[in-house]
Curated annotation (Swiss-Prot):
The active site is at D229, E253. This is Alpha-amylase 1. Its main location: membrane. It is found in: Cell membrane. Substrate binds at W105, R227, K232, Q233, D322, R370. Pfam families: A_amylase_dom_C, Alpha-amylase. The lineage of its organism: Eukaryota, Fungi, Dikarya, Ascomycota, Taphrinomycotina. It comes from Schizosaccharomyces pombe (strain 972 / ATCC 24843) (Fission yeast).
Length: 625
């Protein structure tokens, strides 16, 4: 790193100030995350290295490559990026497991992974992101370290700083079917090619180092949030001090489809990734099992299991680096698009895995679900890219119109095997699992909007008027989702869309000119309007208490269904959690909390101090040079 960057970071540290203001759970609610596998997303040159579909070696993606594609990511509306772990990893190739291109075989907490670029490259990426008001999320590793197999030849000598067996739990293979938490938390993962030795995080020496490490990483690289890997395999008592040391929003990977198991760590973390909701979405849109009835049921169970906790910051996703690409589950584009749109407009923080916008193919296992995106291109006119862009723009519109939209309850107005009608605030979605080749299906929806309200279906860019008693006549074309929003509230939609482009042709497409092709020109004249709409909240139906009853009047035969409101409301805002600040002494971290008003005052004060120190830093550097 050049002197100027080190000097600036050091000057902030000298005054005891963070290099970036800590981002809380409340601030992360408004974010939409794009997850990348650093090695597979983009290269930093015009060259496109060979990287086969099932390649398990490094392919050449870098931090500079991500930086070169920020326009591409931001063009969809994403304002946060989750990157692969950055620490140095195990070198070499290990049988069928290949190389550590994914970043999860860490061996040295003191060095960066040089395959992804230099420290300057990483800082330049983050600096450019922050200049765009995009936030960075680091993947934090604290559960294990990688050792070459086999197990009868274990050596810790190359691990930094934990180069002795005393820093690890005794060797034993984890039994995922065990009900013994100690077995799951203390035993090891991996295989005879690469062993992931389980760190003894109950040890004071180990825990203190990990606290210091994550604190220093956040300070040095201006990290806005962390995703903690493998929290199911860790003692949850470790997390409060660890996240306090980080001082930023922390979301944990809780790999369990059981709502009760998933929610068991919510008292220790700001958030978790929602595997139960992901499974519900898969079953519903792929027409598997109970379909939308199962999605509604698992959604309700998840809310109940996490009762009293803030569900508005749950991380919702359809794909990730550990799961099959959805294209391997269904080859139907309408089902796929419906699942993505549902995810983007649901309660929680949406997370889209790189390549979903290009409908990246992928197998049911790694590395087939981690293909190099440059082999498929970065087409900003692609149907999926534009659909994601439109749905994100609507999400931002809804948040702009109502301070409470992210924490509003969502209601399943009706649901059965083949469809669901979901309302959250003023966003009304009609979703089905009909295939793209299916006939049109008509529904009469009880929308809970006032009579005479003009609604725009944002994906096809058409309007309709609400009839008597809130009735809405909906025709689902080729199985595609329908998403409605009050026309009068779309004044700044073009601003959220940004530069407009139209849908390209695809096997499943919308019947008329796309929202992104026209609304930006229709509404740009009033795009600067960002006031909160009081009329929006007055027409909401999502604040009523939960009801276990559902309509029995839906028909599953024929092409016409009459839907009556069941007001199946799912509450989302429990006891809101805030990220604790961290006070650093020579040996310990102490957490403290403050009210939202004092946090606001402190943030303002920090902003002033940072501005002053920024000027001071510049002067100091110039004088030094």
């Amino acid at each position: 790193m050049g002197f100027s960057k080190i000097a600036l970071f050091s000057l902030f540290a000298l005054f005891g100030l963070p290099t970036s203001l800590a981002k809380s759970s409340e601030e992360w609610r408004d974010r939409i995350i794009y997850q990348v596998i650093t090695d597979r997303f983009a290269v930093d040159s015009d060259n496109t290295p060979d990287c086969s579909f099932d390649d398990s070696s490094y392919c050449g993606g870098t931090w500079s490559g991500i930086r070169s594609k920020l326009d591409y990511i931001q063009g969809m509306g994403f304002n946060a990026i989750w990157i692969s772990p950055v620490e140095k990893n195990l070198e070499g190739s290990y049988g069928s497991d290949g190389e550590a291109y994914h970043g999860y075989w860490n061996t040295d907490f003191t060095q960066l992974n040089e395959h992804f670029g230099s420290e300057d490259d990483l800082i330049d990426l983050i600096t450019d992101m922050h200049n765009r008001d995009m936030w960075i999320m680091f993947d934090a590793l604290a559960n294990s370290m990688a050792i070459p197999g086999p197990t009868d030849n274990i050596s810790y000598s190359n691990l930094v700083p934990f180069n002795d067996s005393s820093y690890f739990h005794p060797y034993c293979w984890i039994d995922y079917g065990s009900n013994n938490n100690t077995d799951i938390e203390d035993c090891w993962t991996g295989d005879d090619n690469v062993i992931l030795a389980d760190l003894d995080i109950e040890s004071t020496n180990v825990a203190d180092y990990l606290h210091e490490h994550i604190h220093d990483m956040v300070e040095r690289y201006q990290i806005d949030g962390i995703r903690i890997d493998a929290v199911k395999q860790m003692n949850p008592e470790f997390f409060p001090n660890y996240t306090s040391a980080a001082g930023v929003f922390a979301i944990g990977e809780m790999f369990s489809y059981d709502p009760n198991v998933s929610c068991s760590v919510r008292n220790y973390l700001d958030s978790i990734t929602s595997y139960p909701i992901r499974q519900g979405i898969e079953f519903a849109f792929n027409y598997t099992g109970a379909a939308f009835e199962y999605l509604q049921e698992i959604d309700t169970q998840f809310q109940q299991a996490c009762e009293g906790q803030d569900m508005s910051v749950i991380g919702n996703f359809l794909e990730n680096h550990d799961l099959p690409r959805y294209t391997s589950i269904t080859n139907d584009t309408s089902q796929d698009i419906g699942a993505i749109v549902f995810l983007l407009l649901h309660t929680g923080i949406p997370i889209i895995y790189y390549g979903e916008e290009q409908r990246l193919p992928g197998g049911s296992d790694t590395p087939e679900n981690r293909a190099a995106l440059w082999n498929y291109g970065y087409d900003t006119d692609a149907n999926y890219y534009q659909t994601i862009r439109t749905a994100i723009a609507l999400r931002k519109q809804a948040i702009s119109d109502s301070d409470s939209w992210t924490t509003d309850s969502h209601s399943y107005l009706d649901y059965d095997l083949r469809h669901a009608v979901v309302r959250k605030g003023d966003v009304l979605g009609v979703y089905t699992n009909y295939e793209s080749s299916s006939d049109n299906v008509t529904y009469d929806v009880s929308s809970n909007f006032d009579d005479g309200t003009v609604l725009r279906e944002v994906l096809s860019n058409t309007t309709t008027t609400v009839g008597s008693s809130g009735a809405l006549h909906v025709t689902v074309v080729s199985g595609l989702p329908q998403v409605y929003y009050p026309e009068a509230s779309l004044t700044s939609f073009g601003n959220f869309l940004g530069t407009a482009t139209s849908y390209s042709s695809a096997s499943a497409s919308y019947p008329s000119t796309s929202m992104s092709a026209s609304l930006s020109s229709v509404h740009t004249s009033s795009a600067t309007s960002s006031s909160k709409s009081s009329s929006s909240s007055s027409s909401r139906s999502g604040s009523s208490s939960s009801s276990s009853s559902r309509s029995g009047s839906t028909s599953s035969s024929g092409s016409s269904h009459t839907i009556t409101s069941t007001s199946q409301s799912v509450h989302t805002s429990g006891s809101s959690t805030s990220t604790s600040s961290v006070a650093v002494t020579s040996t310990a971290y102490s957490s403290s909390s403050s009210s939202s008003s004092s946090s606001s005052i402190e943030s303002s004060a920090n902003a002033v101090r940072v501005s002053i120190l920024g000027v001071a830093a510049f002067i100091a550097i110039v004088l030094f040079i």
